[in-house]
């Protein structure tokens, strides 16, 4: 079983696995691009989020910068989603957020279970 398979199964895994580190670094590059965009660039931000997150319910999504996550593809958000500044998701496991959800500033969601 690979370290990624262990991670996705909710088992203790090695966070310094080469494959996982490569994925983390690729996501960090996208997050850096997202956080560097103008807050007024709604189309640019939406485009990055569509490629980064596992599921977006509709285009009524706002995640204020800065935003941080580990993998992105483990995150699913519903329709009419809003997250305020400094939203952090360590998405080593699935994170599902439903419709009409508003998240305040400085909220963090952690799912990591690594050694």
Outline where the language-model segments fall:
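Short cysteine-rich loop/turn motifs with clustered Cys
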Residues: 59-61, 98
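Terminal amphipathic alpha-helical/low-complexity segments used for targeting or macromolecular assembly
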Residues: 1-59
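Flexible, glycine/small-residue-enriched loop-and-beta-strand segment within the central core
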Residues: 53, 67-77, 82-115
């Amino acid at each position: 079983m690979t370290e990624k398979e262990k991670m996705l199964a909710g088992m203790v895994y090695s966070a310094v696995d080469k494959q996982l580190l490569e994925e983390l670094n690729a996501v960090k590059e996208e997050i850096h691009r997202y956080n560097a965009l103008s807050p007024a660039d709604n189309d640019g931000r939406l485009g990055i989020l569509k490629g980064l997150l596992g599921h977006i319910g509709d285009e009524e999504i706002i995640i204020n910068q800065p935003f941080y996550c580990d993998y992105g593809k483990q995150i699913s958000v519903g329709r009419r989603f809003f997250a305020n500044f400094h939203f952090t998701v360590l998405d080593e496991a699935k994170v599902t957020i439903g419709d009409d959800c508003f998240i305040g500033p400085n909220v963090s969601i952690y799912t990591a279970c690594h050694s």
